[in-house]
């Protein structure tokens, strides 16, 4: 739903006031191409996220209403209403208390997370913390992979953070069910519906002004590629594939492959101080050839992914007292509203420079 007028959005949101919804927030939390989100309060005093979409977007509604997984944002209830001849759905979902991984990653160096983490930070994000995130993302990916679904928009903005640093996948507006339910047969090809520049794989750009149809097994590799881009950003606080929004003609398959090769060269260079197993795993995920990327079983069993599991779970367990302290700190800080472009490059200990690898 591509409505950018916040006043119109607020007007549409208000028609969903029901007996069990007593308050719909004035502040629009997020506006996307397929939906907008605000805060909703129910009569029992609980707060949820309310996502407004046009009702014809049935794939997302069907999926989220049926699917249950600890690393997928859960749907509480779906309301349907008409407004000026258009049908809308309000999806009531659990609300992320710490927003998303983009916001969290931007603030790792501001000291706020010392409240919840028992070990000190050193500049770039440590492998244990990245692994802690990665294992939860993998658990979410496994559940949608097993059900023959592609998310097609995995990125840090769509990875929400809940109590005890639990990561949950959100925003299934681009999902594709890779199975014909009526015939019971898997499709041979699926069209990549789009996604977010910087997280889109080279196969998306293979044809110009195109319908980007790829084989079913390749489609799943798009989610794994985006997972690799996510790990890259979490680790190095840099976009892996800088996007030229003013010249879409530059975004060709060859251009993306060239950027990827430079990224791989830099990751593998000695000046990048990362765990060798992490480098190998990351480079496999962002391979420009989808057939060379690991399948899910290989991801799940990867050596780096399975390092220090018990230690990680112990280190990042948060008790109730610390959770309350964390929330208090967040409420009186700019943690939840920090914009990406406000960060200074000097905040990073390491900056990727693609020119070095030319």
Model-derived features: positions:
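Activation segment/activation loop of eukaryotic-type protein kinase catalytic domains
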Residues: 162-199, 207
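Conserved short submotifs of the Hanks-type protein kinase catalytic core
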Residues: 86-100
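Catalytic-loop of the protein kinase fold
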Residues: 145-162
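Conserved C-lobe activation region of Hanks-type protein kinase-like domains
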Residues: 207-225, 229-268
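Activation segment signature within eukaryotic-like protein kinase domains
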Residues: 133-134
């Amino acid at each position: 739903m591509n409505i950018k007028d916040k006043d119109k959005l607020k007007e549409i949101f208000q028609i969903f006031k029901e007996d069990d919804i007593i308050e719909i927030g004035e502040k629009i939390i997020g506006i996307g191409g397929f939906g907008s989100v605000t805060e909703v309060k129910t009569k029992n005093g609980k707060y949820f996220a309310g996502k407004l979409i046009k009702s014809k977007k049935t794939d997302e509604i069907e999926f989220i209403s049926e699917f249950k997984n600890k690393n997928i944002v859960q749907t509480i209830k779906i309301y349907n209403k008409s407004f000026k001849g258009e049908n809308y759905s309000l999806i009531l979902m659990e609300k992320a208390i710490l927003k998303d991984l983009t916001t969290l990653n931007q603030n790792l160096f501001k000291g706020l997370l010392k409240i919840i983490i028992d070990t000190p930070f050193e500049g770039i994000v440590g492998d244990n913390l990245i692994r802690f995130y990665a294992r939860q993302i993998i658990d979410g990916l496994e559940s949608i992979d097993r059900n023959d679904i592609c998310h097609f928009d995995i990125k840090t903005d769509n990875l929400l953070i809940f109590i005890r640093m639990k990561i949950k996948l959100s925003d299934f507006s681009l999902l594709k069910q890779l199975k014909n339910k009526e015939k019971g047969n898997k499709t041979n090809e699926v069209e990549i519906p789009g996604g977010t520049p910087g997280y889109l794989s080279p196969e998306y750009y293979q044809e110009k002004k195109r319908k980007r149809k790829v084989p079913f097994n390749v489609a799943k590799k798009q989610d794994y590629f985006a997972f690799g881009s996510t790990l890259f950003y979490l680790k190095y606080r840099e976009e892996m594939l800088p996007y030229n929004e003013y010249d879409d003609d530059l975004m060709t398959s060859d251009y993306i492959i060239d950027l990827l090769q430079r990224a791989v060269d830099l990751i593998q260079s000695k000046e990048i101080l990362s765990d060798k197993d992490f480098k190998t795993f990351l480079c496999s995920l962002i391979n420009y050839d989808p057939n060379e990327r690991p399948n899910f079983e290989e991801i799940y069993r990867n050596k780096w992914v399975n390092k220090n599991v018990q230690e990680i779970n112990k280190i990042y367990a948060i008790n109730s007292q610390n959770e309350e302290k964390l929330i208090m700190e967040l409420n009186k800080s700019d943690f939840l509203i920090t914009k990406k472009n406000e960060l200074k490059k000097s905040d990073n200990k390491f900056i990727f420079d693609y020119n070095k690898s030319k």
